[in-house]
C-alpha cells in the first residue's frame, strides 16, 4: 500500500511539474540553444502560457544588448502528436504567429504552416536597430530602418544535429540607414531563403530594390553551414558618402567591397 502511495505521489509531482513548469525554464533553454544571443528576459507565467521581453546580445558575458519594446506573449498546447505554439507581440508580429513543433527520435521539426488561400504571407516587422545588440559589426554600423519578414510556408528540421530547411522566406529591409554614412537612407533590399524539398541545400539571394548602396549576393545553407558571397558598391554620385561604410562591409577591390561568409 505504501509503495502505491509513493508511486502516486511521484506521478502527481511529475504531472504538476509539467503543467506548472515556469516560463523561466523555457528562457534558460532558449539561451543555451542560441549561445546567449537571443534571450527571453523577465520571463513570466509558465512554459504553456507566458510572456517575456525579447533581447538580442553578442553572447554570454557580452555588454551589448538590445530589447524589443513590449512583451512577447505565447501559448503552447497539444496538437495531435505535435505542439502548437501561438505568439503575439504588439510591436512586431502581424496578428498571431502560429508554429507547429513536431518532436521525434533524434530529431525536431518546426513548421510555419502556409496561410489560407488569399491571406497575407506577412509575419511581422522588426526595427533594424534591434540588431545592435548582437555586437560587432552591428554596434558599429548602428543600422536603422525596418525588417519585414514574410513566408508562404517554411519548415526547419534538425536531424541528429544537422539542419534541413524547406519552403521559402523573404526578408525585406526597408529604409536602411547607418551612422557611418551622411546619407539619410542607404536603400531598400530583399533577402530570400529558398529551401530544397530534398533537404540538400537552401539557396540564399540578396538584391537591391533601390538606393545609393548597391548590394548583391548569393549563397546557400548546406550541411548546417552558411556560405555566402556578395558585393557592395556605391551608386554614381554616392562614392564619397559611402566610402567608410564600404571599407567596413567587406574587402575592398577598387570600387567594390567584397563580402564572403563561410
Provide a role label for each language-model segment.
Residues 2-22:
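Hydrophobic membrane-insertion alpha-helices, especially the h-region
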Residues 2-7, 27-33, 181-262:
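Extended terminal
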Residues 23-42:
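Alpha-helical transmembrane signal-anchor/signal-peptide segments
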Residues 38-140:
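N-terminal beta-strand/beta-hairpin edge segment
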Residues 56, 103, 116, 175-177, ...:
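Transmembrane beta-strands of outer-membrane beta-barrel pores
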Residues 81-89, 105-113, 165-169, 202-206, ...:
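Short, well-ordered strand-loop elements centered on a beta-strand within folded domains, enriched
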Residues 104-156, 192-204, 233-262:
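Extended amphipathic, helix-rich lipid-handling scaffolds
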Residues 135-137, 141-218:
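Solvent-exposed beta-strand/coil patches in large extracellular/periplasmic or lumenal scaffold regions
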